[in-house]
C-alpha cells in the first residue's frame, strides 16, 4: 500500500513503498527432460536485447543475471527457475532538509523580506491610482492572481498537511531530523540520462510508416526474443506476465513491471493508442506546460495550450471517465484547464486536489508563503459528461462523487517531475476493474497503460539495485 494514512484532509503516501511492492523480479525459466519419451530443452527468457546498431538490425539475446534458483524433479523431468529481484534506490527519496537553491547565503539574508511579500502586495494594490507613488516592487497580473489564489487555499494546505504530518510522525513513517542524521544524507549522484528517449521518438517519425494492419499490440511473452527498436516506437508493448522483463534500448537497460503496457512516441504518433480498441475509465495527464524555466533549462520540450487541447481525449475516454490533470502553479494554466480545456473535451470539473511536498521529517520542501516556489501542486479532476443513455446504465455500478479540496502529502523523489502514484487514491472513484491510462508518463505501473516520449525514463536500470541473497 502506498497510502500510509488516510484522514479527512486527504492521504499521506509512501511513493518508494509503492514502487518496491511492484515485484521487480526477473525470471529465467529453464526446463530439461520434461518428457520421458521425448526429451527437450528450452529456455524462457524475461530479458530482451534490442540491437543498438540499427532499428532494422537483428535482435541479440541477453540473459538476466542469475540470483535465486528453484529446482524440482519428478517423473517428467526437471525444471529450474532463476530469479533476481530489484528495488528502487531509496536514497532518491532521501529528502532530509528543505530544498536549498544556489547562493544560499544571499537567499537566507533575503528570506525575511521575501516572506512579507504576500501581505505587502495587498497594501501595494490598495494605493489609490491617482496618488503617484513609486513602487519598489511591481507585480504583474499573473503574480497578483497567484497570490490571491494562494491566500484562498493557504489555510487548507497548512491545516490539512499538519494533521497528516502529525499522524506520520506518531506512526514513525516520518521522523524528526535529529533522530536519523548520518553521513548518508549528503549529495546524491544521479544517473546520467544516457538514452534520450525523446530523440528516439523524433527519429522514429522519419522511418517508413507501418500500415494500420501492422500496428498491432506486441506482447512480450516468455519465449519472445524477436523485438527490434522500430517496434518500440510504433506499437503498444505489453508485459502480461507476473514477472518483470528487461529490455535494452540503444545500449540502455530498462525494467518493465509485470502487467504493464506502454507506447513510446510523441504527440504526433498516438495512432496505435487509438487503434488498440480500448477506452479508459481513468486518464491521468501530466502535460509539459510552457514556462520560462523550461525554456531556459532546455530540459524537455513543452506544448502550447492549444496543442494540449487537440489531444484525442474524447476518443480515449469511456463513459464517466475520470480525468486528472496536473497543473503548475501558474493561474493562466489553471484557468485554461477549468474554463477551456475540459469544456472542449466535454469534461465537467468536479474537484481540485493538491500535492503537498514534504521532507522526511515533515517540513515543507519550500516555505509555504515563498513568492518563488510553492511546496504544492494542483490537480484538476473532472468527469466526462455522461455518454450512455439513462436506460442503458448499469444500476449495480455506483461510483461515489469525487470529494473536493483533498491533499496528497508525500516525500517527493529527487528526480525531476517524478509524480506520486495515484492508483490507490483514485480507486474508489473508478468503476471496479476499470482501464487506466497515464499520458506524458515517465514510468510504468502495473495495470496501467502508459504513453509518452519519455515513458521509460524512470524505468532505467540505474535507478534500481539488485537485492543481495537473503534480502
UniProtKB/Swiss-Prot annotation:
GO terms for cellular component: cytosol; mitochondrial matrix; nucleus. It catalyses: a 2'-O-methyladenosine in U2 snRNA + S-adenosyl-L-methionine = an N(6)-methyl-2'-O-methyladenosine in U2 snRNA + S-adenosyl-L-homocysteine + H(+); a 2'-deoxyadenosine in DNA + S-adenosyl-L-methionine = an N(6)-methyl-2'-deoxyadenosine in DNA + S-adenosyl-L-homocysteine + H(+). It is an enzyme of class 2 (transferase). GO terms for molecular function: nucleic acid binding; RNA methyltransferase activity; site-specific DNA-methyltransferase (adenine-specific) activity; U2 snRNA 2'-O-methyladenosine m6 methyltransferase activity. Its main location: nucleus. Coiled coil: none annotated. Its EC number is 2.1.1.72, 2.1.1.-. Belongs to the MT-A70-like family. N(6)-adenine-specific methyltransferase that can methylate both RNAs and DNA. Acts as a N(6)-adenine-specific RNA methyltransferase by catalyzing formation of N6,2'-O-dimethyladenosine (m6A(m)) on internal positions of U2 small nuclear RNA (snRNA): methylates the 6th position of adenine residues with a pre-deposited 2'-O-methylation. Internal m6A(m) methylation of snRNAs regulates RNA splicing. Also able to act as a N(6)-adenine-specific DNA methyltransferase by mediating methylation of DNA on the 6th position of adenine (N(6)-methyladenosine). This is N(6)-adenine-specific methyltransferase METTL4. It comes from Mus musculus. The lineage of its organism: Eukaryota, Metazoa, Chordata, Craniata, Vertebrata. The gene is Mettl4.
Amino acid at each position: 500500500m502506498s497510502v500510509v494514512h488516510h484522514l479527512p484532509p486527504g492521504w499521506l503516501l509512501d511513493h518508494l513503498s509503492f514502487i518496491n511492492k511492484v515485484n521487480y523480479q526477473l525470471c529465467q525459466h529453464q526446463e530439461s527432460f520434461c518428457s520421458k519419451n521425448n526429451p527437450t530443452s528450452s529456455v524462457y527468457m524475461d530479458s530482451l536485447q534490442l540491437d543498438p546498431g540499427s532499428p532494422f538490425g537483428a535482435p541479440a539475446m541477453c540473459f538476466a543475471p542469475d540470483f535465486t534458483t528453484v529446482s524440482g524433479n519428478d517423473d517428467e523431468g526437471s525444471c529450474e527457475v532463476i530469479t533476481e529481484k530489484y528495488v528502487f534506490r531509496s536514497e532518491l527519496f532521501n529528502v532530509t532538509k528543505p530544498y536549498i537553491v544556489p547562493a544560499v547565503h544571499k537567499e537566507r539574508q533575503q528570506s525575511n523580506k521575501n516572506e512579507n511579500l504576500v501581505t505587502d502586495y495587498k497594501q501595494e494594490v490598495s494605493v489609490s491610482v491617482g496618488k503617484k507613488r513609486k513602487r519598489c516592487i511591481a507585480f504583474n497580473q499573473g503574480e497578483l492572481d497567484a497570490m490571491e489564489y494562494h491566500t484562498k487555499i493557504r489555510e487548507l494546505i497548512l491545516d490539512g498537511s499538519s494533521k497528516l504530518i502529525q499522524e506520520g510522525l506518531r506512526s514513525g513513517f516520518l521522523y524528526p531530523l535529529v533522530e536519523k542524521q548520518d553521513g548518508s544524507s549528503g549529495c546524491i549522484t544521479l544517473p546520467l540520462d544516457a538514452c534520450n528517449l525523446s530523440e528516439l521518438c523524433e527519429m522514429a517519425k522519419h522511418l517508413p510508416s507501418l500500415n494500420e494492419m501492422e500496428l498491432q499490440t506486441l506482447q512480450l511473452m516468455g519465449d519472445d526474443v524477436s523485438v527490434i527498436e522500430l517496434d518500440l516506437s510504433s506499437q503498444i508493448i505489453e508485459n502480461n506476465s507476473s514477472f518483470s522483463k528487461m529490455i535494452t534500448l540503444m545500449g540502455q537497460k530498462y525494467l518493465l513491471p509485470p502487467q504493464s503496457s506502454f507506447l513510446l512516441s510523441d504527440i504526433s504518433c498516438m495512432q496505435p493508442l487509438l487503434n488498440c480498441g480500448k477506452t479508459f475509465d481513468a486518464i491521468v495527464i501530466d502535460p509539459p506546460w510552457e514556462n520560462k524555466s523550461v525554456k531556459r533549462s532546455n530540459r524537455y520540450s513543452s506544448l502550447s495550450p492549444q496543442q494540449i487541447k487537440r489531444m484525442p481525449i474524447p476518443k480515449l475516454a469511456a463513459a464517466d471517465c475520470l480525468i486528472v490533470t496536473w497543473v503548475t502553479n501558474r493561474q493562466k494554466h489553471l484557468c485554461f484547464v477549468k474554463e477551456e480545456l475540459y469544456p472542449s473535451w466535454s469534461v465537467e470539473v468536479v474537484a481540485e486536489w493538491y500535492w503537498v511536498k514534504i521532507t522526511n521529517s515533515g517540513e515543507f520542501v519550500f516555505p509555504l508563503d515563498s513568492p518563488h516556489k510553492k511546496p504544492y501542486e494542483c490537480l484538476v479532476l473532472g468527469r466526462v459528461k455522461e455518454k450512455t443513455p439513462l436506460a442503458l446504465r448499469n444500476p449495480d455500478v455506483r461510483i461515489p462523487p469525487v470529494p473536493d479540496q483533498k491533499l496528497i502529502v508525500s516525500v517527493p523523489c529527487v528526480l525531476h517531475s517524478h509524480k506520486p502514484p495515484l492508483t490507490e487514491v483514485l480507486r474508489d472513484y473508478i468503476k471496479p476493474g476499470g482501464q487506466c491510462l497515464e499520458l506524458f508518463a515517465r514510468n510504468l505501473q502495473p495495470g496501467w497503460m502508459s504513453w509518452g516520449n519519455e515513458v521509460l525514463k524512470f524505468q532505467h536500470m540505474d535507478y534500481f539495485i539488485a537485492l543481495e541473497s537473503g534480502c
